[in-house]
Amino acid sequence: MGAHPYYYFIKYQPDIEAALQDLRQREFEAGRYNPAQPFLRFPIRPDSPAPGAKHESIYEAIEDAAEDGTRSILDIETVSDWPDFGVASPLSEEDLQRYFGSKQPTKEMVSRKLDFLASIERGHCVYITVFESGQPSGLFFGGYSFD
């Protein structure tokens, strides 16, 4: 099977690690991960299916997903300045400028250019601070699954 992209827009938090962990917990509790739901539809919306967690913990869900991964943000354990497996790292200013024409992209700019996700390695994730009227308004997390 091929890798699957995933992405999320969430409310801005200055603590990126806390934002990631909150997002992981939200998606786990909603049951929006493989194998609870083998193939998710993005973007996640308020009316997206949420069957509830099918595992006791995120760790158990990751173990059960095995080499396929959860095909979701659950596969991303932490935030780092540098790309790596299981890590969310910031998209560089150069890439922000190249993909969106701005170092402070809006949610709309990112939403229109999701094809940039194809440049992300399997098992990796990036995050972007999105802006509205020059102020941080949200966070974008996007990556590619392992399988």
Predicted feature residues:
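N-terminal domain-onset segments
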Residues: 1-120
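Acidic, proline/glycine-rich low-complexity IDRs
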Residues: 106-147
